[in-house]
Design a protein with these regions (language model features):
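A generic signature of intrinsically disordered, low-complexity regions enriched in glycine/proline
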Residues: 17, 26, 38, 71-75, ...
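Acidic, low-complexity intrinsically disordered segments
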Residues: 2-8, 54-96
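A broad, structure-centric signal for solvent-exposed, well-ordered loop/edge residues
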Residues: 18-21, 37, 50, 55-58, ...
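Flexible, active-site-adjacent loop/turn segments at secondary-structure boundaries
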Residues: 12, 19, 39, 46-49, ...
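Short, charged/polar N-terminal "headpieces" of proteins
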Residues: 2-32
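A short, structured beta-strand/loop element
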Residues: 27-54
């Protein structure tokens, strides 16, 4: 896979590289697509720290950690995704 599009057995793709930091959760939000359905995912700060222990503990640092580990994060998101489910999905340190 080229890294631009991740598609696994769960039929969800992550073609959109948009992501944002949500200080109310605190987590990085990103989106996946299953046909015409959009699913929201959040990866919390503890999970990002587990993946990249040297990440700066601020918005920029967490976004950079997400960008540097996008393929790993999207693979974990695909594992928790349930087709036809509504709502959002949370990735935590235990997912890594």
């Amino acid at each position: 896979m080229g890294g631009n599009l991740i598609s696994l057995d769960h039929m969800i793709d992550f073609p959109n590289h948009s992501r944002s930091y949500d200080p109310t959760r605190p987590a990085v939000r990103f989106w996946g697509h299953d046909s015409a359905i959009e699913a929201s995912f959040f990866i919390n700060e503890d999970a990002l720290k587990r993946i990249q222990p040297d990440a700066r503990p601020d918005e920029s640092g967490f976004l950079n950690a997400f960008d540097s580990n996008r393929d790993l994060i999207c693979a974990a998101a695909a594992k928790v995704y349930v087709r036809g489910s509504r709502g959002s999905y949370d990735l935590v340190a235990a997912n890594f």
